[in-house]
């Protein structure tokens, strides 16, 4: 549980940077996003020194898959899809994006901060909602805001990973501090428990 969608996105991008450095030796990482991706990805790029490669959207305001394939290179650590994008409410082609990422052994983050708690129920109502989650083998992480259509209190979101191996790189630890072991799963060290508790209650 994070403080909001921006922190969920920042944590995910920091995770990919550290994963790529440790597992692939990438020192000059880049991420590929559509021009409609949330501004938090710009913030992550600046904070964590990740080059942000922006690709245009197509006539339906969805990430252009051909453009994405042209710019991905050996330093690409993650490609990003939005479900939906904030500017236009368009769902990027997650199935195609994630499969391309899987074939190229890079991460695929789905920003479902806006639609994460809408699209599953829209599908149940009969709307043609495509798969956007871990049912797709190439999706490696997701962000979804509980404080939007999850109706939790303002100030909560979640970031999810396909497995523990990737999630491990989100954590910050210091083992040689005279004060003892320090470990933090998010950016804040001390956090109020009330928001997490009310989020849990809303989910029930």
Question: Model regions: which residues?
Answer:
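Conserved beta-loop-alpha segment that forms the PLP phosphate-binding cup at the N-terminus of a helix
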Residues: 1-25, 40-44
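Active-site nucleophile and cofactor-binding loops and adjacent substrate-binding regions
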Residues: 1-6, 33-35, 82
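Short acidic, glycine/serine/threonine-rich loops at helix termini
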Residues: 11-14, 42-47, 90-93, 118-125, ...
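Substrate-binding/gating loop at the entrance of the active-site cleft, primarily
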Residues: 32-49
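Active-site-proximal loop/turn and secondary-structure-junction residues that shape catalytic pockets
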Residues: 37, 85, 114-116, 148
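Active-site phosphate-binding strand-loop segment of PLP-dependent enzymes
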Residues: 63-112
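Active-site C-terminal subdomain of aminotransferase-like
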Residues: 124-204
